Curated annotation (Swiss-Prot):
UniProt cross-references to HAMAP family, sorted A to Z: Ribosomal_uL5_B
Family classification: Belongs to the universal ribosomal protein uL5 family.
Descriptive protein name: Large ribosomal subunit protein uL5
Record Pfam families: Ribosomal_L5 (PF00281), Ribosomal_L5_C (PF00673)
Subunit structure: Part of the 50S ribosomal subunit; part of the 5S rRNA/L5/L18/L25 subcomplex. Contacts the 5S rRNA and the P site tRNA. Forms a bridge to the 30S subunit in the 70S ribosome.
Task performed by this protein: This is one of the proteins that bind and probably mediate the attachment of the 5S RNA into the large ribosomal subunit, where it forms part of the central protuberance. In the 70S ribosome it contacts protein S13 of the 30S subunit (bridge B1b), connecting the 2 subunits; this bridge is implicated in subunit movement. Contacts the P site tRNA; the 5S rRNA and some of its associated proteins might help stabilize positioning of ribosome-bound tRNAs.
Organism listed in the record: Paramagnetospirillum magneticum (strain ATCC 700264 / AMB-1)
A GO molecular function held by the record: tRNA binding
Length: 179
C-alpha cells in the first residue's frame, strides 16, 4: 500500500469526517484520479517532439500515455483535424498515490522560486488544477537528455462537493498552498 494511501485512511479521513461532520464515512471526499496533460504545439511540424513528450510522460507517471488529437482544423495554427497535439495519462489507485507523494515531496520543492501552489485553481466542483512550467523538476527526467523544456497540467479529480472540502483533502496530503 502506498504511503499516502495509508496516511489518508488513518489520518486524513477521520480528520475530514470530524471537520465537516459527516454521519457516514463514505461521505468523506477522496481522490478519484490524477490526469497529467502535456500539450506539444510543435508536434504539428515535427513528429519527433511528440515522441519525446510521450517518453518523458511515461517516465514521470510510470504508465504509458495516450496521444491527444486536434478536434478541429485551425488554419492560423497550421493545424489539421486528427493531428497529434499532445499527450495525457490518467492515474488511479496505487500509482496515483505514489505520483502524488513524489509531486508533493520531491518535484514541487525543486521548482525555482517556489512559495506554494495557488489556492484559487479549484473549479467549483471539488477538482483542482495545477500547472508546471518545466518537466525537469521530476527526478526521473535526465536534464542532459531533455530536448525542450515543456510544461504540463496536473488535474486532481476528487469526490468532494465543494472547493473547501477539496482544499481540506489536499491539505491533508500536505499540499503546500499559498496563504
Amino acid at each position: 500500500m502506498a504511503r499516502l494511501r495509508k496516511h489518508y485512511d488513518t489520518v486524513v479521513k477521520p480528520a475530514l469526517q470530524k471537520e465537516f461532520n459527516y454521519a457516514n464515512p463514505m461521505q468523506v471526499p477522496k481522490l478519484q484520479k490524477i490526469v497529467i496533460n502535456m500539450g506539444v504545439g510543435e508536434a504539428a511540424q515535427d513528429s519527433k517532439k511528440i515522441e519525446s513528450a510521450l517518453a518523458e510522460l511515461t517516465l514521470i507517471s510510470g504508465q504509458k500515455p495516450v496521444s491527444t488529437k486536434a478536434k478541429m482544423s485551425i488554419a492560423q495554427f497550421k493545424l489539421r483535424e486528427g493531428q497529434v497535439v499532445g499527450c495525457k495519462v490518467t492515474l488511479r489507485a496505487e500509482r496515483m498515490y505514489e505520483f502524488l507523494d513524489r509531486l508533493i515531496n520531491i518535484a514541487l520543492p525543486r521548482v525555482r522560486d517556489f512559495r506554494g501552489v495557488p489556492g484559487k485553481s479549484f473549479d467549483g466542483r471539488g477538482n483542482y488544477s495545477l500547472g508546471l512550467k518545466e518537466q525537469i523538476v521530476f527526478p526521473e527526467i535526465d536534464y542532459d537528455k531533455v530536448e525542450t523544456i515543456r510544461g504540463m497540467d496536473i488535474i486532481f479529480v476528487t469526490t468532494a462537493k465543494s472547493n473547501e472540502e477539496a482544499k481540506a483533502l489536499l491539505k491533508g496530503f500536505d499540499m503546500p498552498f499559498v496563504a
